[in-house]
Curated annotation (Swiss-Prot):
Predominant localisation class: secreted
Subcellular location(s) per record: Secreted, Cell wall; Membrane
GO biological process: cell wall organization
Top-level lineage group: Eukaryota
Name of this chain's protein: Expansin-B
Function text: May aid fertilization by loosening the cell wall of the stigma and style, thereby facilitating penetration of the pollen tube. Acts selectively on grass cell walls, which are relatively poor in pectins and xyloglucans and rich in glucuronoarabinoxylans and (1-3),(1-4)-beta-D-glucans, when compared with cell walls of other angiosperms, including other monocots.
Family: Belongs to the expansin family. Expansin B subfamily.
Keyword Membrane: yes
Bilayer topology term: Peripheral membrane protein
């Protein structure tokens, strides 16, 4: 999916949605 901002993590990987 598109890049997301997770609380306390910042921008995630676009293909995972999780901080990598």
């Amino acid at each position: 999916g598109p890049p997301k901002v997770a609380p306390g993590k910042x921008i995630s990987a676009s293909f995972g949605g999780e901080w990598l």
